[in-house]
């Protein structure tokens, strides 16, 4: 369809706005200033508010949040509390909350769910890492920013307002703040995102964009646009930029983090920068954009020329301050990330949090900040407590995770040198792909890689090229910022397509009923489709029910598009139209119910023990055991496992009712929060809520006990680290726990009987035996060393001279450790040692003056591997044949 949007609105006509075309960038814009020729945005116009605040009074960030929210509340908009910065809490297509509209996608924007309020106002913290390398350098970029927004969701039956009112509200707010209307321009633009599109205005004053007003009304299909039934007012006001413009500080960072910045400057011993230089630099910083120019030095040169300073001197002066700005921004970003429960890891949102954290730690090292990152983030939490008290409630977790991650970072850096040296040994250039691999696989920041390579170049025999792009972290973040659907390899046969109505699920209304009558709607392949069923289809981590239909075994139950497919052992016994009788295997169902309810109980217990940050990433509910995967930043200790198990069984014994209700999606989210999606994102406007009173609330479609006492004893069998940042708990319930405990008891009794001691003496005895074994092992190693020293003299006269090397090829009786001890005593200078034992073990070791690689040698005389100075493996030829091969190699 052809789109010809008229950007003229009622306000423009009433106040006499003129439509003009910018003489610099050719964009069309609206202005009250008859003499204006440019659009007002940078780089067409420089910042003109620095040193000259543009509002009636100076606003702090907190004051601006309140001012914005109160203004739109007065205009009939219902305030809505913020959502987490982790968008994965309610959607599965993006990781972080990148805009206020993301809070309402996809359910509200697709028209599937009504908005919680309409119209509404929200001040939503957002995180975007696609500009992370600009932060600190441009004066305006932030990783974490607050998008103030008023949204109206217009339908035919419920129309609120559109372009006229939206522009009017914007102009009125800016006037109320004291911004001169003649300085405000509305640039005509177009917005696209998430498959939707629409015209928009970019609202500019004094060289800075303060707001974007989007009118979402199209769906993009290929290269075409189609109108959507819901017309959405999607605005975004930069709360931080409003506060900045109201204060007129050189950069946005001073307006937000003045206390933190001063503390960091004092700690790092960074002197103040001349105000004239800083003001001029900050004004021109509006023209700086790393993603467009790609080279910080080119940008710095422009600033240096403008203020008449040597570029190196300017860089030396400003760079430390830019690092401090970045640290201030990043620590606020981390406060939101960890405060909203992200657990650092090597995947997804955990990867992004670790990226921001390690970049911050690197910058702190670079400028010599001695205070800990915990102290900096504590300051941030204190400053944000008035608006975001929930972040301070997570302080204990935030401090713990910072401790854990800082230790991991130090370990990474310590082992990093060896990793880089090994890579550099075989390369003439460390490429961008190499840098990304070193960062992704080993966690090594590119600056550290460059430091190691620069040192190698100073003392090495060759020069290794390396260039770290100014936008490295942006490149890496963009690769990880979008959620990619995981590839699931299914072992199940794909279900057939059938045209029948959705199956009525009887187990929701009758959870304890085992028999039912139903009509056969379709028979296809080995599946029977009924109009209603008591059989639970596999889903939500829970295994399917089994049983019989008309005496024929039901061996699998699956669901597709609301239709339940019953796989039976003999499909020939069914035809369409039959009235059949189904019977669910109750013993099997009961085990599944117990284990599924136990999953919710253990999740609740783990939250109490480990903290509110834990989030369920997966589960598996079978008849014999259950499995729960949760996020956590370190291994769960034995003491923590015992406490989780104790609390879980306390909940069981408390006989808590397990209630099942269907709720409106908005009502459920407002009442319980996004933790209802622990088991995964659930589609639709109605959710089935499982509530264990006072314990746990989740949106869940599984079968459950009616009371926690029905679960029986819960036994946590084991925990394991299935990936970085994710712990798996395996557990049993009821008689399954009795069986598992019996196995453990048998193991205990059998072990005690073998040692001939009472059960209660087993730990003490095993510990004593272990200590004795360690002592004996130490004695054996010392004896092996002495044997090696003695054998050294026996073998000293058996070396043969071949070229520049003295070579020993000898068959020796002993263990690999004993042969290693012998070789250690002999491999010095120009000596080359090849030892073999009676079990085909082969050892090659060289002295420090031998240039031949032992790794290459062992591949020629046997099979194995190792390093250049030492290799181990197996041999198949005799001593004479091996000696002959070595001579040939040395004579080449």
From Swiss-Prot:
GO terms for biological process, alphabetical: alanyl-tRNA aminoacylation
GO MF assignments: alanine-tRNA ligase activity; aminoacyl-tRNA deacylase activity; ATP binding; tRNA binding; zinc ion binding
GO cellular component: a single term: cytoplasm
Cellular localisation: Cytoplasm
Annotated cofactor note: Binds 1 zinc ion per subunit.
Pfam entry (one): tRNA_SAD
Annotated keywords: Aminoacyl-tRNA synthetase, ATP-binding, Cytoplasm, Ligase, Metal-binding, Nucleotide-binding, Protein biosynthesis, RNA-binding, tRNA-binding, Zinc
CC cofactor: Zn(2+)
Amino acids binding Zn(2+): 596, 600, 700, 704
UniProt catalytic activity: tRNA(Ala) + L-alanine + ATP = L-alanyl-tRNA(Ala) + AMP + diphosphate
rRNA processing among keywords: no
E.C. number(s) listed in UniProt: 6.1.1.7
Record's keyword annotation contains Chloroplast: no
Top-level taxon of the source organism: Archaea
Family of this protein: Belongs to the class-II aminoacyl-tRNA synthetase family.
NCBIfam families assigned: A-tRNA_syn_arch, alaS
Function of the molecule: Catalyzes the attachment of alanine to tRNA(Ala) in a two-step reaction: alanine is first activated by ATP to form Ala-AMP and then transferred to the acceptor end of tRNA(Ala). Also edits incorrectly charged Ser-tRNA(Ala) and Gly-tRNA(Ala) via its editing domain.
Domain notes: Consists of three domains; the N-terminal catalytic domain, the editing domain and the C-terminal C-Ala domain. The editing domain removes incorrectly charged amino acids, while the C-Ala domain, along with tRNA(Ala), serves as a bridge to cooperatively bring together the editing and aminoacylation centers thus stimulating deacylation of misacylated tRNAs.
Protein name (database record): Alanine--tRNA ligase
Organism of provenance: Methanococcus maripaludis (strain C7 / ATCC BAA-1331)
GN (gene name): alaS
